[in-house]
Regions:
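Short, acidic/polar linear motifs in exposed loop/turn regions
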Residues: 57-59, 124
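Detector for glycine-centered tight turns/loop "hinges" at secondary-structure junctions
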Residues: 32, 58, 76-80, 144
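Sec-dependent N-terminal signal peptides
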Residues: 4-16
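Surface-exposed edge beta-strand/loop patches
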Residues: 21-28, 64-73, 101-157
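Solvent-exposed beta-hairpin/edge-strand motifs
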Residues: 66-87
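Short N-terminal segments immediately surrounding and downstream of signal-peptide cleavage
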Residues: 22-41
Length: 157
C-alpha cells in the first residue's frame, strides 16, 4: 500500500513540476536552435534560470553572445540588465560572461546540447515569475541582434 501511495505521490509531483513549465513561451530567431528551460530557482538571493540550447540543424551554428543587450523582467515590475544594482549574468557551458561589454563567439555544434544559465542578481522577494528573459546574440557581419525571448518562467523558492 505504501508503494502505491509513494508512486502516486511521485507521479503527482512530477505532473505539478512539468505543468509549471508548460506555460513557458519560447521564441528563438534561429529555426534550428531549440531552447528548453530546465529550472528557475532562487539561490542566495539570485534567480538562476538554467536552460538547454540545442542546435538540431545539420550545420554548426556560430554566433556571438551580446551580453550588454541581455534583459529580464520579473512579475513584480523589476528590470534586470547590465547595471550594477539589478544585474543579469550569462553563462554558456563553463564560460562566464559577467562583464557587461564582453562578447564572445559561441559554437553551437549540431546535435550537441549546451547548458546555458542566466542569473538575475538581487531578485525581488515578492517575484513569483520571470515575466520575460531576453538573451541577445550578435551577428558580426551586420548590426542585427537576434534575441531569444522566454516568457512566463515560474520561480521556485
Amino acid at each position: 500500500m505504501r508503494k502505491i501511495l509513494l508512486a502516486g505521490l511521485i507521479m503527482f509531483l512530477s505532473g505539478v513540476f512539468a505543468s509549471a513549465f508548460a506555460q513557458v513561451k519560447i521564441v528563438t530567431p534561429y529555426k534550428d536552435l531549440k531552447v528548453k528551460v530546465l529550472r528557475c530557482a532562487v539561490i542566495e538571493g539570485n534567480c538562476v534560470v538554467d536552460m538547454l540550447f540545442e542546435n538540431v540543424g545539420a550545420q554548426d551554428l556560430k554566433i556571438w553572445s551580446s551580453v550588454d543587450f541581455n534583459k529580464a523582467y520579473d512579475d513584480a515590475g523589476n528590470e534586470y540588465n547590465t547595471n550594477y544594482e539589478n544585474r543579469i549574468y550569462f553563462y554558456v557551458g563553463d564560460m562566464k560572461n559577467n562583464i557587461p561589454s564582453f562578447n564572445k563567439e559561441i559554437n553551437f555544434m549540431s546535435e550537441v546540447p549546451v547548458k546555458v544559465r542566466a542569473e538575475l542578481s538581487n531578485i525581488s522577494e515578492i517575484a513569483t515569475a520571470v515575466s520575460r528573459l531576453e538573451i541577445a546574440f550578435w551577428v558580426v557581419t551586420s548590426l542585427e541582434r537576434p534575441t531569444v525571448k522566454i516568457s512566463n518562467i515560474p520561480i521556485s523558492r
